[in-house]
From Swiss-Prot:
<dbReference type="InterPro" id="IPR001228">
    <property type="entry name" value="IspD"/>
</dbReference>
<dbReference type="InterPro" id="IPR050088">
    <property type="entry name" value="IspD/TarI_cytidylyltransf_bact"/>
</dbReference>
<keyword id="KW-0414">Isoprene biosynthesis</keyword>
<dbReference type="InterPro" id="IPR034683">
    <property type="entry name" value="IspD/TarI"/>
</dbReference>
<feature type="site" description="Transition state stabilizer">
    <location>
        <position position="32"/>
    </location>
</feature>
<feature type="site" description="Positions MEP for the nucleophilic attack">
    <location>
        <position position="170"/>
    </location>
</feature>
<comment type="function">
    <text>Catalyzes the formation of 4-diphosphocytidyl-2-C-methyl-D-erythritol from CTP and 2-C-methyl-D-erythritol 4-phosphate (MEP).</text>
</comment>
<comment type="similarity">
    <text>Belongs to the IspD/TarI cytidylyltransferase family. IspD subfamily.</text>
</comment>
<protein>
    <recommendedName>
        <fullName>2-C-methyl-D-erythritol 4-phosphate cytidylyltransferase</fullName>
        <ecNumber>2.7.7.60</ecNumber>
    </recommendedName>
</protein>
<feature type="site" description="Transition state stabilizer">
    <location>
        <position position="25"/>
    </location>
</feature>
<feature type="site" description="Positions MEP for the nucleophilic attack">
    <location>
        <position position="229"/>
    </location>
</feature>
<keyword id="KW-0548">Nucleotidyltransferase</keyword>
<dbReference type="Pfam" id="PF01128">
    <property type="entry name" value="IspD"/>
</dbReference>
<dbReference type="InterPro" id="IPR029044">
    <property type="entry name" value="Nucleotide-diphossugar_trans"/>
</dbReference>
<comment type="pathway">
    <text>Isoprenoid biosynthesis; isopentenyl diphosphate biosynthesis via DXP pathway; isopentenyl diphosphate from 1-deoxy-D-xylulose 5-phosphate: step 2/6.</text>
</comment>
<dbReference type="GO" id="GO:0019288">
    <property type="term" value="P:isopentenyl diphosphate biosynthetic process, methylerythritol 4-phosphate pathway"/>
</dbReference>
<dbReference type="GO" id="GO:0050518">
    <property type="term" value="F:2-C-methyl-D-erythritol 4-phosphate cytidylyltransferase activity"/>
</dbReference>
Length: 249
């Protein structure tokens, strides 16, 4: 894969906000990305962060199909000028990522795509910039932070209950965040191979590259603890506190 660009232009950068989930763990009848966080929906905050990044040329929103019209209304009222289209998501995370890829099929293979969870509304401009910068050298990047907790691997005993099988070295472990960034040629090839495999499923785009393009290095960008994923009701309270105290913007 060549990372060289024609001298007359830099790579175009598209960012896709993945908002196809239903947020069942939030215990809400509404998708979590449409819940309000300090006066704005979670979706708006994620979209606004990517729109504010000077490196990003275009933002695509991949939305839960049942709430597509609601998302269109919310984002139209917010005047997010970089949002070019809002498309329906798939039944799985990988299908929503594929929808994002299809939405930028007019981009060249050397252009860039950032895939970001809508449920991470506190992503910083520094993190977005770092992803784009690293993609001048490699074809895939993932944002991650060191684990402050010990992580164990479990198995089931004879009674069907979990027991510890191994304790991996914490120094070598990272907790993945988003955005995850790619040269479009890399992520296109990875997903083409993945979807050719019967029963393919994935929850992480870097993992798709790692599995289906093992020769392609996936570089780590050090993330920020404030870039939390709003999954449970308590996460919403934490996000509100981070905004209130100025730890996140």
């Amino acid at each position: 894969m060549s990372l060289d660009q024609p001298a007359h232009r830099r790579p175009r950068v598209a960012a896709a906000v993945l908002a196809g989930g239903v947020g069942s763990r939030m215990g809400s009848a509404h998708p979590k990305q449409l819940l309000r966080l300090a006066g704005q929906t979670i979706l708006e905050r994620s979209v606004a962060a990517l729109c504010a990044a000077p490196e990003v040329d275009e933002v695509v929103v991949v939305m839960n199909a049942a709430h597509l019209a609601e998302a269109e209304k919310i984002l139209a009222e917010g005047r997010y000028d970089k949002v070019s289209r809002i498309v329906p998501g798939g039944a799985s995370r990988s299908e929503s990522s594929l929808a994002a890829l299809q939405a930028v099929d007019d981009y060249d293979d050397n252009d860039l795509l950032l895939l970001h969870d809508a449920a991470r509304p506190l992503v910083s401009g520094r993190t977005i910039t770092a992803c784009v910068t690293e993609l001048t050298e490699v074809g895939a990047v993932g944002v991650a932070v060191p684990s402050s907790d010990t992580v164990v691997q479990v198995t089931l005993d004879a009674s069907g209950r979990e027991v510890i099988a191994a304790v991996p070295d914490r120094a070598a472990l990272r907790r993945m965040q988003t955005p995850q960034g790619f040269r479009l040629g890399v992520i296109r090839r990875a997903y083409a191979r993945a979807f050719a495999e019967p029963g393919f499923t994935a929850t992480d785009d870097c993992g798709v590259v790692l599995r289906y393009l093992p020769e392609e290095p996936v570089r780590i960008v050090t993330g920020e603890e404030s870039n939390i994923k709003v999954t449970h009701p308590s996460d919403l309270a934490v996000a509100e506190a981070l905004l209130r105290t100025g730890v996140a913007q």
